[in-house]
Amino acid sequence: MKRLWQHCHAATLKGGKYSIVEDAALVTDGPLIHWIGPRAELPPGDYAERIDLGGAWLTPGLIDCHTHAVFGGNRSGEFEQRLEGVSYAVIAAAGGGIASTVRATREASEEELLASARKRLEPLLRDGVTALEIKSGYGLDLASERKMLRVIRRLGERLPATVRSTCLAAHALPPEYAGRADDYIEHICSTMLPALAGEGLVDAVDAFCEHLAFSPAQVERVFIAARELGLPVKLHAEQLSSLHGSSLAARYRALSADHLEYMTEDDARAMGEAGTVAVLLPGAFYLLRETQLPPIDALRRHGVAMAIASDLNPGTSPALSLRLMLNMACTLFRLTPEETLAGVTLHAARALGLEASHGSLEVGKLADFVAWDIERPAELAYWLGGDLPKRVIRHAEEVYRG
């Protein structure tokens, strides 16, 4: 069924630029974009429905390409402690930090995790997100990681959004493997990944390469295991120190390397040559009061595509707004509004391997788009909060109206 969407302007994000079409029209045929361009050039046709968008601006549906949205409990108490000057080391020694989230996630039922994650994700979806990634990594044993990944799959079946599932078993060392990181990595590679991939629960594999998590050599073992299973890889890298994990990610043609505050020029060059996307996470940078900025100029010099994501998680980025991350990326990291919009559309799609079907308003791609109540695209990075979407459209069907 063909629909005509008109009386609008469009920032198509074709090629990662605004690529603006004034007085635009868009034709959908089933779930796909059939035609887009100036309304004056609209070819004649029969349409089952004509939708007047009232002068709204259209953009591709937003894509949150890095979240940890499935978890038990929350850590608001620790947030208060940190503000009172208690160090993370003291909190962790008392059983807090990621260990507390692992306990709560292991104890929660699948239904409880599903309900809490859905509640967290609703604000993102109402604000224009039509695709997202969710990572596991708070289970850290086979049964609990399976539970998390099953919840992620169920969210994909129930939410009006495309949901990609990433296995992050190599997120932290579980308490039962204390002092035996190599043994845990072996367990991931020989048992967990084959089982979870065999059940169809995994779209990609991630790891945390950092001095408080896993070494590059350990991460490489995970990458090799993922490659043998035919799964693409991603990496948390260079958030707190430089271990050149981003260069390792580039060597394995990772979809993305994420955080990157401490990456070097050589790391950026390697990522540019490999086509690995840099996923920047200003929410975690802000909450942790970091001062080491990602090397944005180096990423630009080497042609590295930059995505922006919420990093929604209970410890370092309890962020329920992807649009807020656009403003943070501009004000904290000095990206342009155009770069940030590309970062939550086309480049975010690339970071999930979805660029053929998502991320820009082009013929043949899915008709996932948002009609915004704004006067120019830069407003998406300018306003802090507010209900800006007039309509959120997924697969040519309205899923939210403001």
UniProtKB/Swiss-Prot annotation:
Any GO CC annotation of this UniProt entry: cytoplasm
GO annotation (BP), single: L-histidine catabolic process to glutamate and formamide
Binding site for N-formimidoyl-L-glutamate: Y138, N313, G315
Gene3D superfamilies found in the cross-reference section: Metal-dependent hydrolases, Urease, subunit C, domain 1
EC number: 3.5.2.7
Catalytic activity of the protein: 4-imidazolone-5-propanoate + H2O = N-formimidoyl-L-glutamate
Residues binding 4-imidazolone-5-propanoate, per UniProt: R75, Y138, H171, Q239, T316
InterPro entries per the UniProt record, alphabetical: Amidohydro-rel (IPR006680), HutI (IPR005920), Metal-dep_hydrolase_composite (IPR011059), Metal_Hydrolase (IPR032466)
Binding site for Fe(3+): H66, H68, H236, D311
Amino-acid positions noted as binding Zn(2+) in the UniProt annotation, renumbered to this chain: H66, H68, H236, D311
Molecular functions (GO terms): imidazolonepropionase activity; iron ion binding; zinc ion binding
CDD domains referenced in this protein's UniProt entry, alphabetically: Imidazolone-5PH
Cofactor note as given: Binds 1 zinc or iron ion per subunit.
Subcellular location as annotated: Cytoplasm
Cofactor(s) listed in the protein's UniProt record: Zn(2+); Fe(3+)
Keyword tRNA-binding: no
Pathway of action: Amino-acid degradation; L-histidine degradation into L-glutamate; N-formimidoyl-L-glutamate from L-histidine: step 3/3
Chief subcellular location: cytoplasm
Residue spans crossing the bilayer: none
Translocase recorded as keyword: no
Keywords of the record: Cytoplasm, Histidine metabolism, Hydrolase, Iron, Metal-binding, Zinc
Any Pfam family: Amidohydro_1
Family: Belongs to the metallo-dependent hydrolases superfamily. HutI family.
Known role: Catalyzes the hydrolytic cleavage of the carbon-nitrogen bond in imidazolone-5-propanoate to yield N-formimidoyl-L-glutamate. It is the third step in the universal histidine degradation pathway.
Name of protein: Imidazolonepropionase
Native species: Pseudomonas aeruginosa (strain LESB58)
Gene of this entry: hutI
